[in-house]
């Protein structure tokens, strides 16, 4: 029986060693699994961080694109405005030439040609957003510049009496105010 006990004892030791080895393998496996789970959590956090950075970078890109488009449009508007301002003295000269030609009876054909040229010029300006400032009615300091005040019993104070030089607006911005005389009783 001793032999049997010894066999049993050896078997128990072997089982114990195998159990210990299995426990160690299980602990290693559990430890490896925990490490993998921690790495997965780290990767998920890194993914979320990178995704957030991407979303922010894309939003910044879109905002920059919109700002550049707006700046480009403003630059074009400013350039158009400067060109329109440069054309106003040419228009003034054309109007004075027309007045001079109309006062000379021998220059009828020239006056007619100047009139057609002036009308065409004004149509082109209008097509591009330039409009003549109206001068009938009340004085508006945003649109008109008063060069003189004149008494007139037939009109109310602040009413425009005479236009001395036409004014123009470009897309609701004053290029040049109308130069007017205003009633002051």
Swiss-Prot record:
Residues 1-37 are annotated as: Disordered. GO terms for biological process: protein folding. Residues 28-37 have a biased composition (Polar residues). Keywords: Chaperone, Cytoplasm, Stress response. InterPro entries: GrpE, GrpE_coiled_coil, GrpE_head. GO terms for cellular component: cytosol. One of its GO terms (molecular function) is protein-folding chaperone binding. It is found in: Cytoplasm. Homodimer. HAMAP family: GrpE. Participates actively in the response to hyperosmotic and heat shock by preventing the aggregation of stress-denatured proteins, in association with DnaK and GrpE. It is the nucleotide exchange factor for DnaK and may function as a thermosensor. Unfolded proteins bind initially to DnaJ; upon interaction with the DnaJ-bound protein, DnaK hydrolyzes its bound ATP, resulting in the formation of a stable complex. GrpE releases ADP from DnaK; ATP binding to DnaK triggers the release of the substrate protein, thus completing the reaction cycle. Belongs to the GrpE family. This is Protein GrpE. It comes from Helicobacter hepaticus (strain ATCC 51449 / 3B1). The lineage of its organism: Bacteria, Pseudomonadati, Campylobacterota, Epsilonproteobacteria, Campylobacterales. The gene is grpE.
